[in-house]
Amino acid sequence: LRTRVLMDAGELGSRNLSVTWIELPSGAEQTLRSDEEAEQAYVVVRGVGSMSVAGDTQQVAEGDLILVPPATEHAIANNGDAELACVSVQSPPVAAAELYSDQLAEVAGYDDEDL
């Protein structure tokens, strides 16, 4: 799992959004998580996988948008053969360090410097 903050609150004139790029190699998955206040939208940019939202798991592919309401457990997984990439938008903003601090990159080819 690799993440990169594309825009944080206060950048580019934004006050209420943060935008994060997420890459998951084949077989990787996020730790199940939720945020009490933030609404979140994922847009799959490439690859295929599955997204679990409030216990309901659906297959996702390039071009799909997934909405996650506040206080809702969710996770995305790459069950395809190629890398899965998506953009995540949160409002109110959530710091990427808070989102991913509990998940280490324990996938072949990734190390702590990639986070």
Predicted regions and their residues:
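A short glycine-rich, His/Asp/Glu-containing loop-to-beta-strand
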Residues: L1-L32, A38
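Short, charged/polar surface micro-motifs in flexible loops or helix N-caps
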Residues: L12-R15, L24-E29, V48-S50, T57, ...
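Hydrophobic/aromatic beta-strand elements that line small-molecule binding cavities or substrate pockets
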Residues: T20-I22, D64, H74
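A generic "binding-loop/recognition-motif" signal
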Residues: A28, E37-A38, D56, T72-E73, ...
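Double-stranded beta-helix
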Residues: A75-L115
